Amino acid sequence: MEETPTASDAADRSLVQRYLDGDRRAATDLVDRYQRPVFTVALRMLGNAQDAEDATQEVFGTVFRSLTTYDPRFRFFSWIYRMTVNQSLNVLKGRKTMVTLEEQLAIPAAGVAVDDALEAEEQVRKALTVLKPDDRAVVVLRYFGSLSYEEIAEVLEVPARTVKSRLFTARERLRTVLLSQGGD
């Protein structure tokens, strides 16, 4: 089903075309527009700010090297999100040491005063690391990227029903992990 282009899609196409026409300011505009969402997806996928910054730089390097191959019939945000997920998966595959489940889910030492909201966010972040990378990508894009099932399917190049299935599996796994954290 062909989607009606949005104003955002038109703006993206315009920026890409300006860049391809030699307007280097368009590169800055594209980075300004997508740096935060790309970093957020990478951070949620990788679980650490330094890796997310490195991945974000790699993504933008790839974007500008590959813009001549971008097909404007497709949404730019899907293209750049796909690159972000791929780069994040590459980083995850390249990590030499695997942290044990117990280490990933370690609760801060007793006596450490932590705001409940920050502690809950930290528990969710740690729980995300337990998910398989494909499941983590679906959760990150849905809940931190606010993408619809159809948009996630477009980014990950899978059917929407696969997105729904992965999301169900991931939520169940997260629920189990989070309940085990609270049930000392």
Residue ranges and their predicted role:
Residues 138-142:
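A short pre-motif secondary-structure segment
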Residues 65-72, 82-102, 117, 169, ...:
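Arg/Lys-rich amphipathic alpha helix in sigma70-family domain 2
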Residues 20-21, 44-49, 58-75, 94-96, ...:
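Sigma70-family region 2
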Residues 31-49, 66, 128, 173, ...:
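Amphipathic, Lys/Arg- and hydrophobic-enriched alpha-helical face
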Residues 2-5, 20-29, 39-58, 160, ...:
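Short, charged helix-capping/linker segments at alpha-helix termini
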Residues 40, 54-61, 74-86:
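Structural recognition of an alpha-helix C-terminal capping motif at a helix-to-coil junction
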Residues 4-12, 97-126:
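Internal acidic/polar
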